[in-house]
Amino acid sequence: MKFCPKCGNLMLPDRKRKVWVCRSCGYEEPFDEEKDREKTVIKQEVKHKPDEGIVVIEQDLKTLPTTKITCPKCGNDTAYWWEMQTRAGDEPSTIFYKCTKCGHTWRSYE
């Protein structure tokens, strides 16, 4: 991150013109590809459709907390759990469970 020496606000890179630009006061400073590369991060937003479902990519579930709940598939009484906001912000979050024995995943709307 780079801050404007005039007003102290965050400066953003304009890669086409190869300058740092302050959107508050208009100050510009040359962009040095070698020196400034590690100060910039390209952010890419991934949008999901509501019907796509939730996929757990990280398989190291041993770091997740566990709770006593019966798995509807195998009857095991322990599951990993995590909470996510899957609906509108003014609605309660969704709790997901994954059985420690068979790996079945289900959800609970709180």
Curated annotation (Swiss-Prot):
Protein's name according to its UniProt entry: Transcription factor S
Family: Belongs to the archaeal RpoM/eukaryotic RPA12/RPB9/RPC11 RNA polymerase family.
Record-linked SMART domains: RPOL9, ZnF_C2C2
PANTHER family: DNA-DIRECTED RNA POLYMERASE, DNA-DIRECTED RNA POLYMERASE III SUBUNIT RPC10
GO MF, one example: zinc ion binding
Keywords recorded for this protein, A-Z: DNA-binding, DNA-directed RNA polymerase, Metal-binding, Transcription, Transcription regulation, Zinc, Zinc-finger
Organism: Thermococcus celer
A single GO BP: DNA-templated transcription
Claim: DNA-binding is one of the keywords in the record: yes
Protein residues bound to Zn(2+) 2: C71, C74, C99, C102
Domain of life: Archaea
Listed GO CC annotations: DNA-directed RNA polymerase complex
UniProt keyword annotation of Zinc-finger present: yes
